[in-house]
């Protein structure tokens, strides 16, 4: 693979001088120039989780549950009131549930914080009970709102817009939360999101996904014909079907048919069906790495139950990310987010590392194993000694965008440590 050629050139150069500072720590390399972790993964993650478990609770929620931009002293970033509830808290629920299980279910406070994220989604972040997308979880909002007002859209969303795919993320996370606690509220909201998605689904083709990227929840007026992230809507439908809700069989079949026949083949073309995911962007040609990597993750998890060609398709999805979004930082191949922002933010880089690790473990193919380990080592250099992380390891600091710093990161390390348990130590 071409990255190995790059590594043989870059890493020896790194070793000829004093090792650089990556994020918050002096980098450590082995004799072959491969980046080592600054502490064990298990220790770094424990420090980070402990730091978040000390987060002040106000209005019934830890602060990071209702704000996206939080500093290293748990205070809000004054200049940033925008907030991404479905993505931040949805992926946070998944992270906390996975870490709770991986850490042998020893600390009930972890489960309690997952409950706080679920409660915020079902109590504070819904659209009004009217219009085309009623009682649907919001993609964006404003920090410290209880509940979010009807016109709370921020970042690149207009005031009354939602992003359908983010409802898939929130719905899937809430259903996972329901499975842990049997709290009916979470199942009810997952069902509501699923039913609203099914009611607003349209036929996809070579230029349109089954849902647009943005929609005015009142009128259904759409903006952006393609939404790249279809894997979580598929996950939500699949999980609702598992719980006996067969009404989702037909929309699920139509969605998978479009993914398999249109979206995956588009990887080898211009990538036009892989544009639009991040809440703060609206460029129509903005391809991203997060969506194909998360579809690859689902194929790897389900294998032949979902896709008889899962190995081939997962490889193509990974290669799309490698081809379009990777670069070298401090001798380490890293993955960026999107066409218009190729910084190795913590969420996408940990996603990249986890999916490559999962593919390596599932197939026995070593093509990506070292790349996965290096990427994830890089991510953890953002974690300070006291456990407070920065949003990426490009420079020193504390806090920032919480989805990148924490909530869309922890579950990726759990997946990688499940694939290769020895990496935890």
Locations of regions flagged by a protein language model:
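Core register positions within helices of long alpha-helical scaffolds
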Residues: 95, 117, 170-180, 193, ...
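Solvent-exposed loop and edge beta-strand segments that line ligand/cofactor-binding
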Residues: 19-30, 34-41, 71-90, 99, ...
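Bacterial N-terminal signal peptides
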Residues: 4-14
């Amino acid at each position: 693979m071409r990255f190995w050629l790059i590594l043989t050139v870059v890493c020896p150069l790194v070793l000829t001088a004093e090792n650089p500072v990556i994020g918050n720590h002096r980098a450590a390399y082995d004799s072959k120039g491969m980046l080592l972790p600054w502490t064990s993964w298990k220790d770094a993650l424990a420090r980070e989780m402990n730091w978040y478990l000390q987060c002040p609770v106000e209005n019934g929620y830890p602060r990071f549950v209702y704000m996206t931009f939080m500093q290293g002293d748990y205070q809000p970033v004054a200049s940033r009131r925008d907030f991404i509830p479905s993505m931040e808290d949805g992926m946070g629920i998944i992270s906390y549930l996975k870490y709770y299980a991986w850490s042998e279910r020893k600390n009930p406070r972890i489960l309690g914080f997952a409950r706080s994220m679920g409660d915020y989604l079902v109590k504070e972040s819904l659209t009004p009970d009217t219009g085309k997308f009623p009682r649907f979880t919001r993609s964006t909002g404003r920090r410290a709102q209880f509940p979010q007002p009807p016109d709370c859209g921020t970042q690149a969303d207009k005031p009354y817009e939602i992003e359908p795919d983010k409802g898939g993320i929130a719905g899937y996370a809430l259903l996972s939360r329901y499975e842990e606690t049997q709290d009916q509220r979470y199942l009810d909201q997952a069902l509501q999101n699923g039913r609203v998605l099914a009611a607003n689904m349209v036929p996809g083709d070579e230029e349109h996904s089954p849902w647009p990227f943005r929609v005015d929840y009142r009128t259904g007026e759409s903006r952006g014909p393609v939404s790249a992230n279809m894997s979580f809507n598929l996950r939500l439908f699949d999980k609702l079907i598992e719980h006996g809700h067969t009404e989702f069989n037909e929309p699920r079949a139509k969605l998978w048919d479009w993914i398999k026949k249109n979206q995956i083949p588009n990887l080898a073309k211009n990538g036009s069906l892989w544009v639009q995911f991040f809440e703060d962007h609206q460029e129509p040609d903005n391809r991203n790495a997060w969506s194909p990597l998360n579809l690859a993750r689902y194929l790897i998890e389900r294998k032949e139950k979902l896709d008889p060609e899962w190995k081939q398709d997962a490889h193509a999805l990974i290669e799309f990310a490698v081809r379009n979004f990777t670069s070298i930082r401090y001798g380490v191949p890293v993955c960026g987010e999107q066409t218009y922002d190729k910084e190795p933010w913590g969420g996408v880089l940990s996603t990249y590392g986890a999916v490559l690790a999962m593919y390596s473990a599932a197939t026995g193919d070593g093509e990506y194993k070292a790349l996965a380990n290096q990427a994830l080592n890089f991510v953890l250099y953002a974690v300070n000694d006291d456990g407070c992380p920065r949003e990426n390891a490009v420079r020193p600091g504390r806090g920032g965008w919480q989805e990148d710093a924490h909530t869309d990161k922890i579950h990726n390390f759990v997946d990688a440590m499940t694939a290769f348990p020895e990496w935890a130590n």
